[in-house]
């Protein structure tokens, strides 16, 4: 029996890829999960795997705050080292979050190899600093490979949940009609700015027969400002795979998790990078999709959402019946997104883990 410790914490972008890998492991592997109290993993993980938590955070704020956080990091590392020895852990997999640093340092101290997966095109601070201490570093986007000092990253892609890889029906609650389906994914971070941009351009689209599903995120207070029979607004959906597979076009942030899901579904996308993302990594993620021809980038600061409106009208023009529209745009973008996709990313990471045992 192989004992694996998965260190993944915080957002869905860290957790869902790790869960996808865990589900792809051989049956004789035993998984222990390392996270942080009061984060998303405390809701998603315990039903499937044994969850252990330690207090960990980023080194941010004033000098005093950073000093306190550094002490907490060292204490967390000691706790993780004890866990590794007590549970006789043989391998560690980290997909990021605050827990990554103490997990990598503790594994190094205990002589246990770590696989670190970096999802974004611009690696985070932990990856840049600690990647050299890992047995292997994997990347989700090729642009990250040359930005991790002291390591030779392997391109594995970004694991997604199994239901994204299987054909799904269009959700029954999607508005009926012959018009194109536009899916907007607001996301949990920075959703307000994107949601306002989208609402500014919806009325003329709806009047032309465009069907719209707007996933606003949980913190949106402006739901209901635009009302129309062809518009559905809700915070979140468990049926995102079916939505993306049947969408003619999506509008989304450019987080690595969302981008990988859009790619495996082959969904033509307008990407609006979150402008406050660390190191502008969403801008770099979006550029990877645009280079493949699968996405168009629109920036949030564009005045009055004019560029967003023009872009949607251009891409959906043929489906909306505009006589001068180019019918090849969406099929070409769909092919571009499919080129970006790596559908066996979970198995590639499993193979990488197994290689460290040989």
UniProtKB/Swiss-Prot annotation:
Keyword field contains Isomerase: no
Amino acids binding UDP-N-acetyl-alpha-D-glucosamine: 11-13, 120, 161, 188, 282
Location of the protein in the cell: Cell inner membrane
GO MF, one annotated term: undecaprenyldiphospho-muramoylpentapeptide beta-N-acetylglucosaminyltransferase activity
Top-rank taxon, per record: Bacteria
Any matching Pfam family: Glyco_tran_28_C
Pathway assigned in UniProt: Cell wall biogenesis; peptidoglycan biosynthesis
Gene Ontology biological-process annotations: carbohydrate metabolic process; cell division; cell wall organization; lipid glycosylation; peptidoglycan biosynthetic process; regulation of cell shape
Keywords, in A-Z order: Cell cycle, Cell division, Cell inner membrane, Cell membrane, Cell shape, Cell wall biogenesis/degradation, Glycosyltransferase, Membrane, Peptidoglycan synthesis, Transferase
Protein's UniProt keywords contain rRNA-binding: no
Family annotation (Gene3D superfamilies): Glycogen Phosphorylase B
GO CC aspect terms: plasma membrane
Function: Cell wall formation. Catalyzes the transfer of a GlcNAc subunit on undecaprenyl-pyrophosphoryl-MurNAc-pentapeptide (lipid intermediate I) to form undecaprenyl-pyrophosphoryl-MurNAc-(pentapeptide)GlcNAc (lipid intermediate II).
Similarity-based family: Belongs to the glycosyltransferase 28 family. MurG subfamily.
HAMAP family for this protein: MurG
Protein's name in the database: UDP-N-acetylglucosamine--N-acetylmuramyl-(pentapeptide) pyrophosphoryl-undecaprenol N-acetylglucosamine transferase
């Amino acid at each position: 029996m192989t004992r694996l410790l998965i260190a993944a914490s915080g957002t869905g972008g860290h957790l869902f890829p790790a869960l996808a890998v865990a589900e792809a492991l051989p049956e004789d592997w035993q998984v222990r999960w390392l996270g942080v109290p009061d984060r998303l993993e405390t809701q998603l993980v315990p039903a499937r795997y044994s969850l252990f938590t330690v207090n960990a955070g980023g080194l941010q704020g004033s000098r005093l705050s950073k000093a306190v956080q550094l002490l907490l990091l060292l204490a967390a590392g000691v706790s993780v080292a004890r866990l590794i020895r007590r549970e006789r852990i043989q391998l560690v997999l980290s997909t990021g979050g605050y827990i990554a640093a103490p997990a990598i340092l503790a594994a190094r101290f205990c002589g246990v190899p770590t696989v670190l997966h970096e999802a974004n095109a611009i690696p985070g601070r932990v990856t840049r600093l600690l990647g050299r201490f890992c047995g292997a570093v994997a990347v989700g986007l090729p642009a990250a490979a040359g930005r991790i000092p002291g390591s030779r990253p392997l391109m594995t892609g970004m694991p997604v949940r199994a239901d994204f890889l299987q054909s799904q029906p269009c959700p029954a609650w999607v508005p009926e009609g012959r018009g194109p389906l536009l899916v907007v994914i607001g996301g949990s971070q920075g959703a307000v700015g994107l949601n306002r941009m989208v609402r500014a351009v919806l009325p003329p689209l709806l009047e032309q027969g465009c069907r719209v599903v707007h996933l606003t995120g949980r913190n949106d207070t402006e739901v209901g400002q635009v009302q129309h029979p062809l518009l559905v607004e809700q915070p979140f959906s468990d049926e995102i795979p079916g939505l993306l597979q049947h969408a003619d076009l999506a509008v989304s942030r450019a987080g690595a998790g969302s981008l990988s899901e859009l790619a495996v579904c082959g969904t033509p996308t307008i990407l609006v990078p979150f402008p406050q993302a660390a190191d502008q990594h969403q801008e770099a993620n979006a550029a990877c999709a645009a280079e493949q021809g699968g996405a168009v980038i629109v920036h949030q600061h564009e005045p009055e959402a004019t560029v967003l409106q023009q872009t949607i009208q251009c891409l959906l023009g043929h489906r909306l019946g505009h006589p001068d529209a180019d019918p090849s745009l969406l099929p070409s973008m769909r092919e571009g997104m499919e080129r970006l996709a790596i559908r066996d990313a979970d198995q590639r990471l499993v193979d990488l883990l197994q290689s460290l045992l040989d």
